[in-house]
Amino acid sequence: MSNNKKLTSLFGAPVSDRENSMTAGPRGPLVMQDWYFLEQMAHFDREVIPERRMHAKGSGAFGTFTVTNDITQYTSASIFSEVGKQTEMFARFSTVAGERGAADAERDIRGFALKFYTDEGNWDLVGNNTPVFFFRDPKLFASLNHAVKRDPRTNMRSAQNNWDFWTSLPEALHQVTILMSDRGIPKGYRNMHGFGSHTYSMYNDKGERVWVKFHHRTQQGIENLQPDEAAKIIADDRESSQRDLFEAIENKDYPKWKTYIQVMTEEQARNHKDNPFDLTKVWYKGDYPLIEVGEWELNRNPDNYFQDVEQAAFAPTNIVPGIDFSPDKMLQGRLFSYGDAQRYRLGVNHWQIPVNQPKGVGVENICPFSRDGQMRILDNNQGGGTHYYPNSDGSFEDQPEFKKPGLKVEGEAYEYDFRQDDDNYFEQPGRLFRLQSKEQQERIFENTANEMQGTTLEVQHRHIRHCYKADSEYGKGVARALGVDINDVDLEIKD
């Protein structure tokens, strides 16, 4: 059935022949004046944009966030201003280490990025399906990427590189334990929790600040894959999580998550046993219980994957009044890295791409000072109005009513060794290990041994030592699974 759409060039000229190039005679060479061939091939040569350095393989969908509980005592953010208020949103889930062609069912951390189109601007909440991370200083970001990506000589993923890096950082054990557990391979994106991971802050209309962590709990139930199940799925379908999410939404089986916060006062933070801004640790729910905030569902698939998912740009600098940052060093590092990566990948005007536009405010109502740059098209480039400040016509006036409360800091600017401040690497992973059933613990041992195939004895000993310091049974179990005599491991080396 024809839709009667006639082929044109990019600039609207009719195309007379889609299949046959212009040649000098029926068997002669091409001629350069075949403008449609040149246009088509030149565009094709540039179709692929740089993939994300991490989180390259992803899936996304649009949805709606609904406030279900009053938290205005903590925040003045308009998105949370009243129970029942709804805000449009976009979510992108991803694997982390693999490239765009990687399989969805690999053992890996999963990215969990949310964009809320609030009436005060876009709010991006960028996190993972784990509440912690491998380290707590952003200077190690590039090294993590190199360690989990392809080896520069073999161009293959290297267990040795991966585990050598992880085990060189004793604080990584918490994240590694989660990754080697059943939750290391979610069945699909619909069946996993999400976390903002970092510590953020909220402040209310009185300027009172609290520290918060965000949690998103799946309403579909947690479901994970065992390695043999994952291997069978990968053999048949490398897009298993994408397919599951897309088909569920197409079938109107809309996935839902409930959002919660943990709240810590500034006084509690000052007296907290550990650094409350340390991304390698959690806040125990018994001390800081979950407070329900809202629920969101994903109910619309993108019409075009490239336009909406591949070009979606998230950055933790996209916040709204009532929500702010914290001294979390990893968050501080991401404040630069994410936006800078998007400017490289998509261009300085990526905010004009439909999925990134501040829809809750309305593009016609924004007044950015930035002008020009490649592909500036959306807002008439601010027209012929004033393009400097200060000025006499009132353009680009500040909005002082949105000033944030001050944050008291102390100490000299210095490259402090965080290990001198906190070397409590093993308490939380040990506690996590003991929360597992015996069967779950055995699977951690087996998964660890499988993933460590090809690593040196030095690296294996290092990991066994860390596990033993978290819990002696943890270390013994990993040693047994690796076929290592634990008596050969020096368990007394200080990490």
UniProtKB/Swiss-Prot annotation:
- Entries under Pfam families matching the protein: Catalase, Catalase-rel
Question: What cofactor does its activity depend on?
Answer: heme
Q: Which GO terms describe its molecular function?
A: catalase activity; heme binding; metal ion binding
SUPFAM superfamilies recorded for this chain? Heme-dependent catalase-like
- Under which main EC class is this enzyme filed? oxidoreductase
**Keyword Oxidoreductase annotated:** yes
One of the GO biological process terms:
response to hydrogen peroxide
Coiled-coil intervals, chain numbering: none
Binding locations of heme:
Y338
Please give the start and end residues of each transmembrane region: none
| Annotated stretches, region: Disordered | 1-25
Question: Where, by residue number, is the active site?
Answer: H55, N128
Q: Which reaction does it catalyse?
A: 2 H2O2 = O2 + 2 H2O
The highest taxon in the source lineage is: Bacteria
Q: What family is this protein classified in?
A: Belongs to the catalase family.
Name this polypeptide is given = Catalase B
**Organism, per UniProt?**
Staphylococcus xylosus
